[in-house]
Amino acid sequence: MRPIYDIGPFRSSVKNKDTQLNVYVSDKHFKIDVFEDELRSSPAILKEYLRQVSRQEPDFIPEADEDGFYEDTLDEMHDWILRPFMPIFRSLPPLDTSQRYTLQDCLFAEELHYRVKAEENELVPVFLEESDGKENHLVGAQLPPSNIDYSMFPFYSPRDIHVAIDEKATSLTAVPRQVFLPGRAEPCFFKIVYAGDVGITLRELRTYSKIRAIEAGNPIRTPQLHGIVQDDRGSIMGLLLSYIDSGGSALSCIDVSDPQYSGLPQKWFDQISRTLEVLHAHGIVWGDAKADNVLIDLNENAYLIDFGGGYTEGWVDKGKSDSIEGDLQGLQHIKEFLFP
């Protein structure tokens, strides 16, 4: 059964156990605040809430079921907190899937703000306010002046970007991925930019401007930047990248020992190595080099993605992050992943 809501950004803090859920139902955005202090009147509710929060920690490893599948702890937390919201969700008119929707509709949907309290061992929704969705405080970064040549990339309003909606959809997409530009038949991947992503976005823009120069004479297996989405206030809402149809899976999701992939690990390693070699020759560092950041398309070709920088423990040492040395260390770990 298709879920009635679509999960958007989940917010938490290292300072406390408060959280915020953002979900889309029909064409509405529900912003739901959960404060630890407001659950203290019910020890049972508070205990379960803290258990759910602890399961969102990066180092938490869920248990596999009898079929070897791992539960999605974020989905489970949403299921639990949103249970008392279901009558509210079901009271909304269904999504009109015949309508043409844009990024504007998704990113600036009408917002309904709630908090949750505990009463007699039950979670209870408390309505706070409704807004017209003209602002989205979660999405969009104001970039400072830089030496980036923006002239090579077209800018688009979110109103210009079409978001395809499945005819069976029950809600707008909380974080649209596949979008369409005016006059372009092929889809683009919309990489959303959140309010705190200033440094990451500047780094990606610099990298994609260099990749654009490489692509002219030496095609490489990375996405290209086809445009930038900017709202009426001048905030960068997202990047429009080449859409790599990978069936939704990264290299890290592939069991390379499966006979159906016989011979492919060597092909993929050669493609990854060659792409990295070309990038380094042009002064471009991949950054967060790991199997998660390699997509395998439907033609079984490997593409490097995510040029926002950083590192992932177990793939690149912190002291080698954002360096050629770090890229080569990540490449070695990818090789070990491909040839266990």
Identify the residue ranges that each predicted region occupies.
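Eukaryote-biased feature marking scaffold/signaling PDZ-domain proteins and nuclear chromatin regulators
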Residues: A185, R203, I220, G234-I236, ...
